[in-house]
Structures are given as structure tokens and as C-alpha cells.
């Protein structure tokens, strides 16, 4: 017996040297593994099983692999118990039997084997071979994470991110992602980047987020490529580079990434550098259609917009409505807003303002900013029946919370909410809050907000000088809308709040005409001022 033990140890040592060499010499290792395995060495039994499972140094032989794993597993060797469990779970070389897999994982996990703890956790998480138990899954991930098992650290991070089996905690989730990322777990690298981008469990850090996305992208991760592309597309955390964005989106698209398809389609739709070729319409539609065919609802909706507008495809309102309904049925709020606008304008359907409002409110409840504005505006103006100012304020305030100063609907909604507070419409009258909202909308580029703020000071607060400054700010910071230019022109004409200056009044009236667009009131009043001054239009 002592001689057998010594011989087993010698052969096992020889096999380990050959197997663990750089590079491994599998063909030379297998005979030594067989000899030591025949003497019952568990490491050699398990390792020889692995060689048979993957055809390393010997022919691929799954039944033999299972038999060898079982020999070592029966001797209590955790790696073999784990490998045997994986064969049972995946049905590799045998009929799938997750329950039998769970049996062997329980044995290995009880001995503290990290991989088994992790894999058993996935079974409890999904309810495969065992009764679903999210708390048990999280505990098992925690046990393996404590031992430094990267996949478990990542999975535990997901548990804390989503509140799955544990109380939701973004800080702990980020910590686990960082632990796994430090070991090169690419999905964890990406998730950590997302947390830094969104400010989850830490302060927002767009630069750090872009760096992590770049790390994931360099490893070939399509999520990382898509998110890094978005950073370059928007100039978030990196210098804006539309061409680089297009390149990265394309890399992710080549891997079948649906969000990248959608975003790249928009690059072509907007004709940005790198996506501005003569065939850009065809490419945009092709990408929208490709993503839509795989169930990406944003692309379903935007393909509908292409059909509604006849952009890149023949105009087909019936097809547009079909696509909008498909996306709306799947809960896409933007599609609900599109259906509302079709009902409002009578495009493809008979005009129905009540149906339009219903769709707008559905989209608003889903968080779509355009739908929130449209619902609020319909209710504020009573376009679908009796006005409901309180409900209008509700949707304007929901829109305000989204903090989207780059969106016209947001700027207009904040201005309109200011109007509600100014006049006590659907909310208690509050000039201070109205001023704050007007300033916020104005600073985001809304000309009417500066005009309304000026009017409030001119009419309610009887302060023409302050009104003039607000009008002036609107003239200087906003390039659309002639209201501020006209109002300031009238103050200069009459010497109210400013020193009378008819030349300045004429100059501003002409600017108001230039910016008026189709605003008939501004055109009429600016023309009248020029006529009074005997000036050319």
C-alpha cells in the first residue's frame, strides 16, 4: 500500500509537470495521468476526465469523461464533483438532469469550492434542478465572491443592483463589479462604467465611465463598443467625435448589437460625419428594419416614422400606424405619442382629439417627454374637451423632473408650467416659482420664457427696467422667436425702462421680423412699429 501511494504520488507529480507546463504537453501528460488515475489519484482522475471531455491529448470521449469525474467525485474531490455537475446540467454526453447537477454542486459547495458555490447559485436563481430561491442564490454568490471568484462577484453585483435576494444597494453592487473588473471580468467592467455614467452608488463621472467602456470595447464587448460610441456621439466623458462613434457602432452592429443598430441608424438619419454618404437613407432604413425584425421596439417605432414621413421609403401611413401600434402594444411610450399625434392631426386615421389625448397620457405615464408635453398642453388648452389645469400641471411637473434642457418639448413645458404658477392655473398662484421656471426655461434657450418673465415684471411688478433686461437677455441668448426683440423695441420706442431711442427700436423691430417665423402677431406689430417710424421693413 505504501509503495502504491508513493508510486501514485510520483506519477501524479510527473503528470502535473507535463499538464501545467507552458505550453502544456497534453499528449505526454495523458499516459502519466492514466497511470496515476488507475492508482486512484483524484487530481489525475479529474484532469484525465477534462482531457477526455475536451479532446486534449486524447480522443474526445464524453462518457469516459463522466465516468472519470464520477470516480473522483465519489472520493469527495470538489473539482470533479463540479465538473460532473456541469455535464448533468448541460446534458453534455448524457440526458440533461439539472437536479443531479445540483446534487453534486451541493456536495462541492459544502466543501467551500468557489466555482460550485457560484454555479449552484445560478441554479437557485433560475430555479433549475432546485426550487427557485433568490436569497439562497445571493448567499452562495457571496460565499464565492468572498473567495475572489470573479463570476460570483459580478453576479452578486447584479443581485445588489436589482434587489434580487438582497436589499437593493448600488454602492455594494458597484463594489462587487469593481472587484470582478479588477480580475478582467468584462461584463463587470461595462457595468461599472454604466454606474459611473449614471451616478449609481457613486458620483457621476463621465470620464471614468468612458474609460471603462473603452476597456470593455477593446476586449471586443459589444455593449462597451456601443456605449463608448454613444460617448463619442454626444461628447460625454470624451471629446465629441462623430466619425469615431460611427466606427464603434459599426463594430457592435457586426456582433448583432440591437441598440447599436438603432443608434447607427440615427447617425445615418442625421447625416453626421462618417454616416453622410449618398445612400444614408437606405442604410438608416435597413438598420431600423434589421433591429425591428429582432424585436427592438424603438426601431419599430422609428421605422414607422420613416413610413409616415416617406423618408427613405415610399410614404405609407397604414404601415406607419401598424408599426406604431406594434411598438405601443409592447409598452413603448414614444410609439404611444406618435399614435396620439396621428389622431391629433388626422394622419392615417380620422381626426380624434379625445383619442389623441388618451394616447398622449398613456405615453406620458410611460415617461416619454414629448407625450408629457402634449398631454399637458391638451389639458391646459382644453383641446379635447373641458380644460383640466390640475392634470396639466401634473404632466408639466413630470416633464420638469426629467431635466432635458436639450429637448424643445422640455423647454416649452417648463415655460408653460411657469405660466400656470404665474396665473394660478391648476396650482396656487406663486410669482416666485413662476420666475424660477421662466429663468430655467430661458437659460435653456426658450425665447418665450424671457418674454414672459419680462412681461411679468412689466405688468405685475411694474418694473419696466427689469423687464427690459429680461427682454434683452432673450434677444441675446435665443436665436428663434421675435417676441423679446419686439417687446424691447416697444420699450425703446416709448422710453419705458430704457432711454428712448427710436433707431434702436427700428433695429430691434427688424430683428423681430427676421426671427418671427410664421408668428403673425409679431409680424403685424413689428411692421406697425416700422411704419410709425417711417422705416423700411
Residue ranges and their predicted role:
Residues 2-3, 513-537:
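Terminal, low-structured helical/coil segments at or just beyond the last alpha-helical repeat
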Residues 7-35, 39, 50-53, 158:
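Alpha-helical segment of the N-proximal tetratricopeptide repeat
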Residues 14-20, 47-54, 83-90, 119-126, ...:
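Hydrophobic face of amphipathic alpha-helices that form TPR/SEL1-like repeat modules
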Residues 471-474, 499-517:
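TPR/TPR-like (Sel1-like) alpha-helical repeat modules
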Amino acid at each position: 500500500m505504501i509503495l502504491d501511494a508513493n508510486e501514485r504520488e510520483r506519477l501524479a507529480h510527473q503528470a502535473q509537470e507535463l499538464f501545467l507546463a507552458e505550453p502544456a504537453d497534453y499528449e505526454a501528460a495523458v499516459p502519466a495521468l492514466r497511470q496515476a488515475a488507475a492508482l486512484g489519484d483524484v487530481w489525475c482522475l479529474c484532469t484525465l476526465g477534462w482531457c477526455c471531455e475536451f479532446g486534449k491529448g486524447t480522443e474526445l470521449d464524453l462518457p469516459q469523461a463522466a465516468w472519470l469525474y464520477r470516480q473522483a467525485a465519489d472520493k469527495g474531490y470538489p473539482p470533479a464533483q463540479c465538473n460532473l455537475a456541469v455535464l448533468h446540467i448541460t446534458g453534455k454526453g448524457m440526458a440533461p438532469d439539472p437536479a443531479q447537477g445540483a446534487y453534486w454542486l451541493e456536495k462541492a459547495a459544502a466543501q467551500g469550492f468557489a466555482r460550485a458555490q457560484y454555479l449552484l447559485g445560478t441554479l437557485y436563481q433560475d430555479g433549475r434542478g432546485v426550487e427557485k430561491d433568490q436569497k439562497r442564490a445571493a448567499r452562495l454568490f457571496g460565499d464565492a465572491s468572498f473567495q475572489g471568484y470573479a463570476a460570483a462577484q459580478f453576479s452578486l453585483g447584479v443581485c445588489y443592483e436589482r434587489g434580487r435576494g438582497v436589499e437593493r444597494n448600488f454602492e455594494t453592487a458597484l463594489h462587487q463589479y469593481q472587484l470582478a473588473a479588477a480580475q478582467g471580468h468584462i461584463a463587470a467592467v461595462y457595468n461599472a462604467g454604466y454606474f459611473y455614467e449614471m451616478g449609481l452608488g457613486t458620483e457621476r463621472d463621465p470620464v471614468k465611465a468612458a474609460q471603462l467602456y473603452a476597456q470593455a470595447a477593446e476586449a471586443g464587448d459589444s455593449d462597451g463598443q456601443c456605449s463608448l460610441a454613444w460617448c463619442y456621439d454626444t461628447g460625454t466623458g470624451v471629446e465629441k467625435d462623430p466619425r469615431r462613434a460611427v466606427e464603434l457602432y459599426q463594430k457592435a452592429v457586426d456582433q448583432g448589437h440591437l441598440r447599436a443598430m438603432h443608434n447607427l441608424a440615427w447617425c445615418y438619419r442625421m447625416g453626421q460625419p462618417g454616416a453622410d454618404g449618398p445612400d444614408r437613407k437606405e442604410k438608416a432604413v435597413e438598420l431600423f428594419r434589421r433591429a425591428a425584425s429582432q424585436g427592438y421596439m424603438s426601431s419599430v417605432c422609428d421605422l414607422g416614422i420613416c413610413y409616415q414621413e416617406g423618408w427613405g421609403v415610399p410614404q405609407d401611413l397604414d404601415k406607419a400606424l401598424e408599426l406604431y401600434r406594434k411598438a405601443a402594444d409592447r409598452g413603448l411610450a414614444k410609439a404611444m405619442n406618435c399614435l396620439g399625434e396621428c389622431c391629433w392631426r388626422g394622419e392615417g386615421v380620422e381626426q380624434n382629439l379625445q383619442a389623441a389625448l388618451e394616447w398622449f397620457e398613456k405615453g406620458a405615464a410611460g415617461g416619454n417627454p414629448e407625450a408629457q408635453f402634449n398631454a399637458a398642453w391638451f389639458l391646459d388648452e382644453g383641446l379635447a374637451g373641458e380644460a383640466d389645469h390640475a392634470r396639466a400641471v401634473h404632466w408639466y411637473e413630470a416633464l420638469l423632473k426629467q431635466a432635458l434642457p436639450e429637448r424643445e418639448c422640455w423647454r416649452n413645458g417648463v415655460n408653460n408650467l411657469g405660466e400656470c404658477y404665474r396665473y394660478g392655473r391648476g396650482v396656487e398662484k406663486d410669482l416666485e416659482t413662476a420666475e424660477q421656471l421662466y429663468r430655467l426655461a430661458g437659460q435653456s434657450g426658450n425665447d418665450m420664457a424671457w418674454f414672459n418673465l419680462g412681461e411679468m415684471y412689466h405688468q405685475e411688478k411694474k418694473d419696466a427696467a427689469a423687464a427690459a433686461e429680461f427682454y434683452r437677455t432673450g434677444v441675446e441668448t435665443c436665436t428663434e422667436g421675435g417676441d423679446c426683440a419686439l417687446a424691447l423695441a416697444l420699450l425703446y420706442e416709448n422710453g419705458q425702462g430704457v432711454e428712448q431711442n427710436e433707431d434702436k427700436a427700428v433695429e430691434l423691430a427688424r430683428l423681430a421680423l427676421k426671427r418671427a417665423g410664421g408668428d403673425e402677431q409679431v409680424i403685424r406689430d413689428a411692421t406697425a412699429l416700422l411704419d410709425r417710424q417711417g422705416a423700411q421693413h
